[in-house]
Amino acid sequence: MMKQYQLWYDAPAKDWNIALPLGNGRMGAMVFGGTVLERISLNEDSCWYGGFRDRVNPDAKKYLPVVRQLLKEDRIAEAQQLAEEALTATPDGERHYEVLCDLILQQLDGETPEGLHGMRNLRGQDMSRHERPVSGYRRALDITDGVHQVSYVRKEKQIRRECFLSVPHQVFAMHHEGFSSRVLLRRGAYVNRIDKVDEHTILLSGQAGDGGVQYMAMCRAVGEGVHVIGNTLHIGETADIYLASATSYRFADLRAACLSRLETATADGYAAVKAAHVAEHRAVMARCTLALHGEDALDNLPTDQRLARYAQGNADNGLEELYFAFGRYLLAGCSRPGTLPANLQGIWNDDFHPAWDGKYTININTEMNYWCAEVCNLSEMHLPLFDHLRRMQPHGAQVALGMYGANGWVAHHNTDLWGDCAPQDTYCPATYWPMGAAWLCLHIAEHYRYTLDADFLRANYDLMTGAADFFLDTAILREDGMYTVSPSSSPENVYI
C-alpha cells in the first residue's frame, strides 16, 4: 500500500512562500489556508508579457572576429567592452512570466467583513493580519493524492475546504463547508474586465501588458444560495467551486475555452472530478518511491517543526522520504505533456516581474529541473522541454546566422515563452555563453536512453545535429591542436 505523504502545518500561511502548491502542468496554485480570507494565487504557464522580437544586434557579425582577436591577445577588458556593445542583443532582455490572478474566498461569519478595496491586490501582503481566532487548525498538502485540505473551528462551526488542480478536467476545483462566503477574482495590474457571466459564474480578463498574451480566468460555483451581485460571486454554507483559465497563446476564443471546461466539470460533478484527479495523480506518484524507514511518530509533527528539528542535526529519514516525494510532485505539477516546460519557478509565481523574469535559464537551471525526470520515472514530464526546443530551433537558426554567420542553431543562457535564443542581459559571465542549445539537446539523448523510443529519437535527431552543426562552423582550432569556442565563459564565473 502506498504511503500517504503530507506536508502539514498548524497555522495559515502568512506569505506566498509558505503557501502550499498545486499544479496540473498548465495551471499552478499556491493555497494559503486562511481562516476568514482564503487566498489562492493562480498561474497559467502561458501568461507572459510581450510578444516575440528579433533582437540580434545588427553589428554582431561585423565585430565578432574583433572580439575573438582581442581575447586571443589576452586583451580581456577591451574584448568585454566591445562585446557589451556589439554582441549584446537589442534590446538586451527577453519577455517575462506573469501572474494569472488571485481567487479569494471571504467568509461572512457575522462580523463586519473587510471592504473589497483591501482585496484589490493581496500580492506581497502579510496575510496574518486577516486571520481570526480559531481552534483545531490544520492545513495539509497530500502529495500522494494531490489534494490540499484545511480544517478548523470558528465560532463553534466546523470549517472544511479541500482543493486540487485536475489534469483530466483541466480545472481548479474546491469543495467548501463553512460560513456563507463571497468569492472574488482579482489581479494587481493589466485587467480589462471583471464581469458577471451568469448567476453562478464570474470572469476576469485582460492582456499581459503591451503585446502580451490575452488571458481569462472564469469561476463558477454550484450549491444552494449561489448568486452573483455585480462581479462578486456569493456561495452558501456548502458549495463546489471550479475555475478554468485560458490564454491567446493556445486559444482564439478564451471565453468558449473556459466555459467548455466549466461545463464539463460541473456536469460530471465534484465527486467524479475529484475521483478522476486522484486516480491519475496517484498513478504518477506510485511509480517511484524512496524507503528510508523513518520514525512514524515524527509524522505527527508539523512540517515546519520537523524542518527546524532536522536543521539542528536530528535525524529524520521520513522527512527525507517526504521531500523526495515532494520533488517528484513539483515536477509533475509544473510539466505535463502538452504544457510549457518548467520555468525558473516551476509554474508558481506571485510577481509581475519575478526574479530573473521567471524565464527559462538554460545555463543550468532548466537542466536541473529535469535531472530527476527519467531516473524518477517521470519520463513523459520531460516532453514539454523537447517541445520547447522545437519552438526555439528556428529562432536559434536565425541567431546563428545573424550573429555568427553559422549554420545550425544556437541558444544562449536564457529563453522565453516564444523560444527567443538571442543573448540575454549585459552580464559578461553569462550573456555571451553560446552552449544553451547543445546542453539542452543532451536531454534528448537522456530520454532515449531510458525509453529506447526510436520514433522519438528520429523525430528529434535534427535538433541535436543542428546544435552540433553550429559548433562545426564556429569552433576554432588552436595552435596546440585543441578546439575552442570564442567568445564564451564558464557559466557565471569571473576572472579573479
Where are the model-predicted features located?
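Aromatic-lined, polymer-binding surfaces characteristic
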Residues: 474-496
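Membrane-interfacial loop-to-helix junctions in multi-pass inner-membrane proteins
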Residues: 456-460
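Aromatic-residue-lined binding/catalytic grooves and analogous aromatic/hydrophobic interfacial grooves
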Residues: 1-429, 435, 444-448, 461, ...
